[in-house]
Curated annotation (Swiss-Prot):
Name this polypeptide is given: Proline iminopeptidase
Active site: 104 (nucleophile), 244, 271 (proton donor)
Zinc found in the keyword field: no
GO MF annotations in UniProt: aminopeptidase activity; hydrolase activity
Keywords assigned by UniProt, alphabetized: Aminopeptidase, Hydrolase, Protease
Domain of life: Bacteria
Record-linked SUPFAM superfamilies: alpha/beta-Hydrolases
Enzymatic reactions: Release of N-terminal proline from a peptide
PANTHER family: AB HYDROLASE SUPERFAMILY PROTEIN YCLE, MONOACYLGLYCEROL LIPASE
GO biological process, one term: proteolysis
Signal sequence segment: none
Organism per entry: Clostridium botulinum (strain Hall / ATCC 3502 / NCTC 13319 / Type A)
């Protein structure tokens, strides 16, 4: 499979991108927006197989993480920076018609892009384990925190009250929460792209989102497109896991509000069904893409 890597100038920095395969016939490329902010493209390499269907798959590290520039620039860590980076990437690579998949923060980015920028040439959106509003997300994570052992709940409350997240007790509580709803530990049997060391965009995450998944406090804390998503015209596939941070309530809220949408719930997954149920996810995704080219 042909893999092309390169860098695009963005602001005074550079953005790394990776293109797998080429489009054949009438197929349109699939562009992937990673989560975080700051999570890197790495985990998306488990979707390289989508290119075997005769479709280019394009992933990139958003500014502030991975193989892209990682300046200490808290002033840049907001939705506008990353959406304009996507717009620039489409121009740079001549991506007139695409399918756009955003996971977690990447899905928020896709939603804001769709609602505020109303871009042309989007054949479909795939909203993967994402959210229409930070307030709904916080409410659902708080509900789930209440299922942790009491001492873990207490450690979280103490850390939040003091604004100090360095205690061992807090870190163990957060790790348990993420183990339940985000992802399992990476081990020797995990795909290489998950085991590979990466430059996580910690500053980008903390500045834009916050200290953890249940306390949005950064530049995205007021993210809310609950009303606007009702006007998305393009076909939308919503994907989520049963134990996902994107709970069935969050996913169904999007499904109910977005007119031309379908929802696929992955029964054995947390926040990354494309990793945990890889074969099924690729099957669902290929079927969707072929239907909407």
């Amino acid at each position: 499979m042909k893999i092309t890597e390169g860098y695009m100038p963005y602001l005074e920095y550079k953005t790394y991108y990776r293109i797998v395969g080429e489009c054949t016939g009438n197929k349109k490329p699939l562009v992937l927006l990673h989560g975080g902010p700051g999570s890197t493209h790495n985990y998306f390499e488990v979707l390289d197989k989508v290119a075997e269907d005769g479709r280019a798959v394009i992933m990139y590290d958003q500014l502030g993480c991975g193989l892209s520039a990682t300046p200490s620039r808290p002033d840049l860590w907001n939705a506008k920076t990353w959406i304009e980076e996507l717009i620039q990437l489409r121009k740079h690579l001549g991506l007139d018609e695409i399918h756009l998949l955003g996971q977690s923060w990447g899905g928020m980015q896709a939603i804001q892009y769709a609602c505020e920028y109303k871009p042309e040439g989007i054949k479909s959106y795939i909203l993967s384990s994402t959210l229409p509003a930070a307030s709904l997300w916080e409410k659902e994570q708080r509900r789930r925190v209440a299922y942790l052992p009491q001492e873990m709940q207490d450690a979280i409350a103490k850390a939040e009250k003091a604004g100090d997240y360095s205690s061992k007790e807090y870190q163990e509580a957060e790790a348990e929460f993420m183990l339940r709803h985000c992802a399992g530990a990476v081990g020797p049997d995990s795909p290489e792209c998950l085991r590979r060391p990466k430059v996580a965009g910690t500053e980008a995450y903390v500045t834009a989102w916050g200290q953890n998944e249940f306390s949005p406090s950064g530049t995205l804390k007021n993210f809310d497109f609950m009303k606007e998503i009702e006007d998305i015209k393009e076909p939308c596939l919503i994907t989520s896991g049963l134990l996902d941070l994107c709970s069935p309530l969050v996913a169904k809220t999007m499904y109910d509000k977005i007119p031309n949408s379908e929802w696929e719930l992955f029964e054995f997954s947390r926040h990354m069904p494309f990793v945990e149920e890889n074969e099924k996810y690729i099957e669902v995704l290929n079927k969707w893409l072929n239907k909407n080219d």
